[in-house]
UniProtKB/Swiss-Prot annotation:
Superkingdom of origin organism: Eukaryota
Keyword terms of this UniProt record: DNA-binding, Flowering, Nucleus, Transcription, Transcription regulation
Gene this chain is encoded by: MADS1
Function: Probable transcription factor involved in flower development.
InterPro entries: MADS-box/MEF2_TF, MEF2-like_N, TF_Kbox, TF_MADSbox, TF_MADSbox_sf
This protein's name: Agamous-like MADS-box protein MADS1
PANTHER family reported for this sequence: SERUM RESPONSE FACTOR HOMOLOG (PTHR48019)
PROSITE patterns assigned: K_BOX (PS51297), MADS_BOX_1 (PS00350), MADS_BOX_2 (PS50066)
A single GO cellular-component term on record: nucleus
Tissue specificity: Expressed in flowers and seeds.
SMART domains xref list: MADS
Pfam families cross-referenced by the UniProt entry: K-box (PF01486), SRF-TF (PF00319)
BP-aspect Gene Ontology terms: flower development; positive regulation of transcription by RNA polymerase II; regulation of transcription by RNA polymerase II
GO molecular function: DNA-binding transcription factor activity, RNA polymerase II-specific; protein dimerization activity; RNA polymerase II cis-regulatory region sequence-specific DNA binding
Length: 225
């Protein structure tokens, strides 16, 4: 008569549960040893009892085998599912951007006083506060630009006034200089016409004319020469 099939479920009796644990643990450790020897496999086995006691077996080292396992899992996840991870990342980013765009569009409509029916009292109050702060900053910036423009125009006005005074002084100085030149005795020589000179004798041509009539002063000057 064959052995009956044992139902796999938690053993309620504490003593029976402990006895079964010891038997199966020893059998599991034996099979792990046989697997490592017969198949030249790297085997690591870790078992914790219900009381928290540790039982382990490794033909190499439990820590070394665990590190090897973690490395293999990391490499496979980095190489095997890169495209899948990238696709998932871009989908998440696209979804995030769509939400941001939708929120910005809703905020713009709220600022323009549209689609306010979807807001409650608290949200309307927050929107009002944000608008008041925004208007305050806009007015402050506008006044800042206005004061800067006024200051620039005042400086420009002073520069133009200084330039005007300088030009007036130059004109007055030129007029005084012209008046002084008109009063100088040497101005009578300006009415004497220029006469041509002989290139050899360096004398006016009319002085070389024998028919030229000299004044007494001129004759005396010629005699002295």
């Amino acid at each position: 008569m064959g052995r009956g099939k044992i139902e796999i479920k938690r053993i309620e009796n504490t003593t029976n549960r402990q006895v079964t644990f010891c038997k199966r643990r020893n059998g599991l450790l034996k099979k792990a040893y046989e697997l490592s020897v017969l198949c030249d496999a790297e085997v690591a086995l870790i078992v914790f009892s219900s009381r928290g006691r540790l039982y382990e077996y490794a033909n190499n080292s439990v820590r070394t085998t665990i590190e090897r396992y973690k490395k293999v899992c990391s490499d496979s996840s980095n190489t095997g599912s890169v495209s899948e991870a990238n696709a998932q990342f871009y989908q998440q980013e696209a979804s995030k951007l769509r939400r941001q765009i939708r929120d910005i569009q809703n905020l713009n409509r709220h600022i323009l006083g549209e689609a306010l029916s979807s807001l409650n009292f608290k949200e309307l109050k927050n929107l009002e506060t944000r608008l008041e702060k925004g208007i305050s900053r806009i007015r402050s910036k506008k006044n800042e630009l206005l004061f800067a423009e006024i200051e620039y125009m005042q400086k420009r006005e002073i520069e133009l006034q200084n330039s005007n005074l300088f030009l007036r002084a130059q004109i007055a100085e030129n007029e005084r200089a012209q008046q002084q030149m008109n009063l100088m005795p040497g101005s009578q020589y300006e009415s004497v016409p220029q006469q041509p000179y002989d290139s050899q004798n360096l004398l006016p041509v009319n002085l070389l004319d024998p028919n030229h009539h000299y004044s007494r002063h001129d004759q005396t000057a010629l005699q002295l020469v």
